[in-house]
Amino acid sequence: MLLFALLLAMELPLVAASATMRAQWTYSLRCHDCAVINDFNCPNIRVCPYHIRRCMTISIRINSRELLVYKNCTNNCTFVYAAEQPPEAPGKIFKTNSFYWVCCCNSMVCNAGGPTNLERDMLPDEVTEEELPEGTVRLGVSKLLLSFASIIVSNILP
């Protein structure tokens, strides 16, 4: 009986404190909030509503050179689970408008940054030219002799 009274005396102040001081201990999650192109660094931070307990980062490929990066608060992270994702559309291949990188987390400003290999993925367009072997000429720079040889060979062959 004495043990029960001691336990009750120890727990009662904790229950009273949590009931009366709930407003001071409200979990106010803070997340980055932005929608930008090709940049995972977002300076804006917002305080999420009380019932929302997760931050998200979604990046979607717009085209081969641009990513739309969206960061905000969310209460639903099912988009990261394979079982919750919609099935693939049959017969259509989408080269753009697909997820590039997603993140869902539940701590203060946890959606900062993004993947570090973005620079390697977004390479500039460059033309690759191979060296021509000896004796060949570039298209449009052909010599008169090669033109005549081509005409003669095309007339000889059936």
From Swiss-Prot:
Q: Which domain of life is it from?
A: Eukaryota
Presence of the UniProt keyword Phosphoprotein in the record: no
Q: How does it sit in the membrane?
A: Lipid-anchor; GPI-anchor
> Where does the protein end up?
Cell membrane
Q: Which PROSITE patterns match?
A: LY6_UPAR
* Cleaved signal peptide residues: 1-17
Q: Which InterPro entries does its entry note? A: CD59_antigen_CS, LY6_UPA_recep-like, Snake_toxin-like_sf, Sperm-ZP_regulatory
Up-regulation conditions: By p53/TP53.
What biological processes does GO assign it?
Answer: apoptotic process; DNA damage response, signal transduction by p53 class mediator; negative regulation of cell population proliferation
Keyword terms:
Cell membrane, Disulfide bond, Glycoprotein, GPI-anchor, Lipoprotein, Membrane, Signal
Q: What is its main location?
A: membrane
Q: Which GO terms describe its cellular component?
A: extrinsic component of membrane; plasma membrane; side of membrane
Disulphide bond pairs: C31-C55, C34-C42, C48-C73, C77-C104, C105-C110
Query: Locate the UPAR/Ly6 domain: which residues?
Result: 29-134
Q: What does this protein do?
A: May play a role in the apoptotic pathway or cell-cycle regulation induced by p53/TP53 after DNA damage.
UniProt protein name = Glycosyl-phosphatidylinositol-anchored molecule-like protein
Origin organism is Homo sapiens
* Upper classification of the organism: Eukaryota, Metazoa, Chordata, Craniata, Vertebrata
The gene name reads GML
